[in-house]
Every structure is written in C-alpha cells, then in structure tokens.
Amino acid sequence: AGKYFEATDKNFQTEILDSDKAVLVDFWASWCGPCMMLGPVIEQLADDYEGKAIIAKLNVDENPNIAGQYGIRSIPTMLIIKGGKVVDQMVGALPKNMIAKKIDEHIG
C-alpha cells in the first residue's frame, strides 16, 4: 500500500522541491477538524498515485518555517509542487475526485 510522505522543515528541500515527480503537500494540524476529515482521503490518494506522484503531509505546528514560507493562512491547504515551484493550490477538505483531477493535470 502507498504511504503518504511526512514532510518537515528539514526534508522539504530534498524530498519535495528537488523531486522529479509532482508532489501534493497537505498542510494540516491535529486540532483542525477539516484536516482530520481530509486525512483518509490523503491516504487513499497515496495509494492511488504510488509511483506516479508523491503525496505528502506537513504538520504546520511542527514545521512553521515551511508553512510560513508558503504563506499558509488557513488549513487544510494543499499545494501541488512540480520542479520546485507551486503549480496549484487548493483550500479546504475537498472531495477526493477534485484533488485527483488537479494532480492528474500535473503528472505525465
């Protein structure tokens, strides 16, 4: 089964920005209700896109530098990063098919 990647301030550059695959990063926190609702969706996406894209989660409380760098104000916010640049942004606990459609636009 695919597993989402646990992004941190420390590994963000090497694992996310330097990745040759498209990366979905879910900015979340444990106290955020909608983030918790999105959790299982992120896990399903990690399964669906195994080998095709990287699905990552970043805890904003534990990794304030990256969250600040990207100006994350409300969570959950999902960024799609490709070639080190943000190519798409989504805010809120969106349905899986909407998120998948966005990822599909940036892979291949």
UniProtKB/Swiss-Prot annotation:
Sample GO molecular function, one term: protein-disulfide reductase activity
Gene3D superfamilies, A to Z: Glutaredoxin
Keyword annotations from UniProtKB, A to Z: Disulfide bond, Electron transport, Redox-active center, Transport
Domain (Thioredoxin) ranges: 2-108
Superkingdom, taxonomy of origin: Bacteria
Gene Ontology cellular-component annotations: cytosol
SUPFAM superfamilies: Thioredoxin-like (SSF52833)
Pfam families reported in the protein's UniProt record: Thioredoxin
Disulfide bonding pattern of the chain: 32-35
PANTHER family the UniProt entry points to: GEO12009P1
Family: Belongs to the thioredoxin family.
NCBIfam families: thioredoxin
Role played: Participates in various redox reactions through the reversible oxidation of its active center dithiol to a disulfide and catalyzes dithiol-disulfide exchange reactions.
Protein name: Thioredoxin
